[in-house]
Amino acid sequence: MQRDEAPFSADHQKLWRMDESSIWCLKNGRREENPAISVMRTLWDQPRWLEAHYLYDDRGSELFEKICQLPEYYLTRTEESILERTAADIIAAAPVECIVELGAGSAKKTTHLLAAQIEQRKNGIFAPIDVSLPGLILSREFNRRHLPQIRFHGLHARYEEGFASIDKNLSTLFVFLGSTLGNFNAASFVRFFSQLSDAMGPNDFLLLGVDRIKDIQVLERAYADSRGLTAEFILNVFAHINRLVESNFDLAKMRYHSWYNREWQQIEMYALSTAAQEIRFPSFGTSFWWEKNDRILVEISRKFDPERLQQQLRFFTLNPVRHFTDPNEWFSLLLFKKAAD
């Protein structure tokens, strides 16, 4: 592969390159459902819920970055400490040409893997996929300054949109960090791994970061911090939705509530209405009543038994290779290899 050639398959014809910047976009634009229809579809469900990606407007992304620095929120620093300690072992176990990060953001944690790739193989390709263009630009600029041996080709898309664009002729390590998998319900879990497995070649690997089942007090503190940043983050979604669809959620009449659901092994994050509100959607001429003390589920964060998860992913032809964890066994990095057909 030539130095300036993108790591995309024939489907790269559906992409366009932004002013020679090594960031690619879908030619026909990202496939987006009308946000009003998307929001109404889930709010008319019983129980009511929202799709978690609405959390990440500019303010939401800023709040989440602050949450990651909180003493109660152990996930980010624990995962990065594992990566820092084991990156060389991961790259040695997964000899690939290309690293594709799904939902990369600024790709800060992945730099440990890229540095190990340079140390062991002198060069390589990094292809982050993310819906955040500013995050991709930050990642590209960091890569240019600190990792010039790595060829950078970012893709501005949702990862499921980007799967089909990755060249199967390249040996690839797919990276999915941050326990983002924990935000998936059962249907999303199956859909994600079905699509990912189809996109992988027989010499490809997956590195998966997941939060583990642990003491309930530790879990609940991580999602109910003393500064109230998580509450602000969750309730901010309604300000975002108000701007998107011209609805009238009143943030002054709601509060945040979270708890650990033992049966489903997940933290559940809700907005609870403190007074009855008529929520209107003027562009559709419809409304619903959000009654006092009724809840809307905004996000879940599932926790995992790593051994059980390894067995589940065999169904998607992903075989376990290595398991890395921290001294407290709070978080796991799981390395899988795609089985040959």
Residue positions per predicted region:
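Conserved SAM-binding loop of SAM-dependent methyltransferases across substrates and taxa
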Residues: 106-121
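A short glycine-rich, Lys/Arg-flanked "PGG" loop and its adjoining helix->strand segment in the class I
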Residues: 190-202
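Conserved class I S-adenosyl-L-methionine
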Residues: 96-105
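Conserved beta-strand signature within the Rossmann-like core of class I S-adenosyl-L-methionine
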Residues: 199-213
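Class I SAM-dependent methyltransferase Rossmann-like catalytic core
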Residues: 47-94
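Substrate-binding/catalytic lobe of Class I Rossmann-like enzymes that use SAM or dcSAM, i.e.
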Residues: 220-306, 310-318
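Conserved SAM/SAH-binding beta-strand->alpha-helix loop
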Residues: 129-133
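N-terminal auxiliary segments of SAM/dcSAM-dependent transferases
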Residues: 2-54, 61
